[in-house]
Design a protein with these regions (language model features):
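Sec-dependent bacterial lipoprotein signal peptides
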Residues: 1-17
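An internal, short helix-loop-strand segment that often contains or flanks glycine-aspartate motifs
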Residues: 55-61, 65-93, 125-243, 314-318, ...
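Helix N-cap motif at beta-to-alpha junctions
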Residues: 112-116, 163-166, 351-354, 416-419
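C-terminal "exit" segments of structured domains
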Residues: 492-493, 501-506, 514-516
Length: 516
């Protein structure tokens, strides 16, 4: 507990106090890394407004947190808070996090500015019982801190752990090898590393499918092809903290031919969204997602994968999936109206109602369940289905109650009957600021946090609200879209306060939640 408390507090103080080029510490990054993230501590500290009064209050509280867990350490902690360079680590250079191929190890990399000061810091931690005694071998100094290995030399600092729980000391030779390696033998000499640098994000994350164990890749690719190379299926996410919003962009860097062909065939089965479903729900709807598909092409694309094809062919419910998919052509949307109770409705533009015959064909089979399942007509092209225990069909245990059918040219599927006939009184989603951005996108999703808080406050008393809602109450909405022109995924998390950087607002929130 003392170790965890120290590193949580220390990480926060380092980030908050960071305000010189030098040794080539990036050469330590393993060449076979399957994921690499970089954090611009200097830029984030400036955006957090730590030079103002709120920032100073946050720093003092975090320093107090450290002091409470480490006795007789007040002087050193005060020196580090006053001057981060006293830690011996650079808080002006980027911090790196990495994960090796197949997740055999994960680590943090920082630049060392003063090896002696870093040694003093670790000696103090050793006296506090936080880490073991320092040892020197293979050209580096190292120690063990719980399940983590710390190793460093005059250029670089490594904190390494094995997600599977391997003994920390067993990783010393790998860490020493990375600390000794030349730049040409590291991840820093790859095109993917350059992509991270070119992105210039406050936080940038590069990852490939090689991050996953072999046993996890097959289900994700659904048995698509043995020719797929996981290390060539990769993406880069860039996050920036801006005034009033957090912005994240994700783009594919995939070069694997198998996956590129899969993606191309998927895009051939989809098209830009028309936005026809925006008028179906009020402006304060909690959550909504949409895309536009050619159902017949999508079904063909799905069936090109052997695992998915088997799933359709051996479904526990004998439906004509080809007929259902082929009826869909146009916008498809999924709406969550009440997040606390999970109320939802799926809508899809259809060109025919003929596919409902496959539902009628189920009636003899359902009649043989002795009332365990019931399928009832509720008007023209309208059905109600009830099942006493969903686990019979590998669904969640307990009663399952849904309504589905076709109405006004749209197929619907919902767990709340009143959503079928719901009318919009007043402004619809189309009248919102974000509603004007939907048309033409490949995918568009929105989460309305103002609506969420209205639902929560009308359902729960203030004393019943989890602490997380204190933060959520400061949010406006989150939108996620895939643009037609570059197929890049763009996400924005908007705060209610549009006049301050979101990191500065987070600093104020820390003061609020930790205040006495």
């Amino acid at each position: 507990m003392k170790t965890l408390k120290y590193w949580i507090g220390a990480a926060a103080v380092w980030v908050l106090t960071a305000c010189s080029g030098g040794a080539d510490y990036e050469r330590v990054l393993p060449k076979d890394a399957a994921a690499v993230a970089t954090v611009d501590l200097k830029a984030m500290a400036a955006k957090a407004g730590l030079q103002n009064s709120e920032g100073q209050v946050a720093m003092n509280r975090l320093a107090d947190l450290l002091k409470s867990g480490l006795t007789d350490s007040e002087n050193l902690i005060d020196r580090i808070v006053a001057d981060p360079d006293e830690s011996g680590l650079s808080l002006k250079d980027r911090l790196y996090l990495f994960v090796e191929k197949r997740s055999v190890s994960a680590g943090v990399l920082m630049r060392v500015t003063d090896e002696d000061k870093l040694t003093d810091l670790l000696e103090m931690l050793k006296e506090q019982g936080v880490c073991e005694a320092l040892r020197e071998s293979d050209g580096c100094t190292w120690t063990v801190m719980g399940k983590m290995l710390i190793a460093y030399n005059e250029d670089a600092f490594l904190l390494v752990m094995d997600p599977s729980g391997r003994n920390a000391g067993d990783m010393q030779h790998s860490a020493a090898k990375w600390l000794r390696q030349k730049r040409e033998d590291s991840f820093a000499e790859t095109e993917d590393y350059q992509s991270i640098q070119d992105a210039k994000g406050d936080i940038s994350v590069w990852a490939s499918m090689a991050l996953l164990p072999e046993r996890a890749i097959y289900p994700l690719t659904m048995g698509g092809s043995a020719e797929l190379k996981g290390e060539d299926v990769k993406a880069l996410a860039t996050m920036n903290f801006e005034t009033g919003k957090l912005v994240c962009d994700v783009r594919s860097l995939t070069t694997d031919k198998v996956m590129m062909k899969v993606a191309e065939e998927y895009f051939n089965a989809t098209s830009p969204v028309k936005g026809d479903h925006l008028d179906d729900f009020p402006a304060n709807t909690f959550g909504w997602s949409t895309l536009s598909v050619d159902g017949a092409k999508l079904y063909k694309w799905l069936n090109s994968n052997p695992a998915v094809k088997r799933m359709f062919e051996h479904s526990m419910i004998p439906l004509d999936f080809h007929a259902i998919f082929s009826a869909v052509k146009g916008d498809v949307s999924f709406t969550v109206t009440n997040p606390l109770y999970g109320d939802y409705i799926l809508l899809a533009d259809v060109v025919s109602t003929d596919f409902l015959q496959t539902v009628e064909d189920l009636k003899p089979m359902i009649a043989m369940t002795g009332g365990q399942m019931r399928l009832m007509n509720r008007g023209e092209h309208a059905y109600e289905f009830y099942m006493m225990d969903g686990s019979v069909l590998n669904m969640r245990p307990g009663p399952v109650h849904v309504w589905f059918g076709v109405k006004d040219g749209k197929m619907y599927f919902t767990n709340r009957e009143n959503l079928v006939e719901r009318k919009v009184l007043g402004l619809s989603m189309k009248n919102t600021e974000w509603g004007k951005e939907v048309e033409g996108k490949r995918v568009f999703s929105v989460v309305n946090f103002i609506s969420l808080m209205q639902t929560v406050s009308s359902t729960l008393r203030k004393q019943q609200m989890p602490p997380v809602f204190i933060g959520l109450d400061r949010l406006d909405r989150m939108t996620v879209e895939m643009r037609e022109e570059d197929k890049m995924v763009h996400m924005e998390l908007l705060f209610k306060d549009r006049n301050r950087n979101v990191l500065e607002q987070m600093t104020a929130l820390v003061n609020l939640t930790t205040g006495k």
